[in-house]
């Protein structure tokens, strides 16, 4: 599925900031598989639907101007399902997962647990992809540098605290010290 020429075309289209549509779908497929397998659900269908849930093959940012489609978020599940059915044999669960992955933006709620999971993993992956982009925009030298600079401003330049605990990594203290001083 991931090597199908039609699926590989998703690499050409940006999706969330710098993440391609292909990478986003791969992320969703991975988390769908892991979560559904953990709960003893249909992990294979979850992974397949995750890989195909955004198979719309256009840059959605300019789509409205070109087509007049007012709300991409509400219409792209139908486009993705149409494209997926054209190239792949889908079961009913995979169809539902692709069609309802945008709930609550799309009005019909999911019927199966796997569909609820793709709804949540899609939001989670999208949030992480956007957050990762803006983290690098807002903190180009890393959050460690930002926190160390903030601590020095608040507590004074002579304050020495060796461990700034950050959930998203850190740079070496020598590098940060050179950038702050």
Language-model segments: residues:
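Metal-dependent phosphohydrolase cores
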Residues: 1-181
């Amino acid at each position: 599925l991931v090597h199908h020429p039609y699926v590989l075309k998703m690499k050409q289209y940006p999706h969330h900031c710098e993440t391609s549509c292909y990478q986003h779908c791969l992320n969703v497929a991975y988390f769908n598989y892991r979560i559904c397998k953990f709960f003893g659900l249909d992990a294979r269908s979850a992974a397949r639907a995750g890989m195909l849930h955004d198979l719309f093959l256009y840059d959605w940012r300019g789509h409205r101007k070109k087509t007049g489609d007012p709300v991409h978020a509400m219409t792209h599940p139908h486009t993705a399902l149409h494209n997926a059915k054209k190239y792949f044999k889908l079961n009913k669960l995979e169809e539902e997962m692709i069609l309802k992955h945008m709930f609550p933006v799309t009005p019909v709620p999911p019927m199966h647990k796997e569909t609820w999971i793709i709804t949540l993993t899609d939001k989670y992956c999208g949030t992480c992809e956007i957050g990762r982009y803006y983290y690098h925009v807002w903190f180009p030298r890393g959050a460690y540098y930002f926190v160390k600079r903030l601590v020095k401003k608040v507590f004074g330049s002579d304050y020495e605290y060796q461990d700034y605990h950050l959930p998203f990594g850190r740079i070496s203290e020598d590098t940060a010290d050179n950038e702050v001083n």
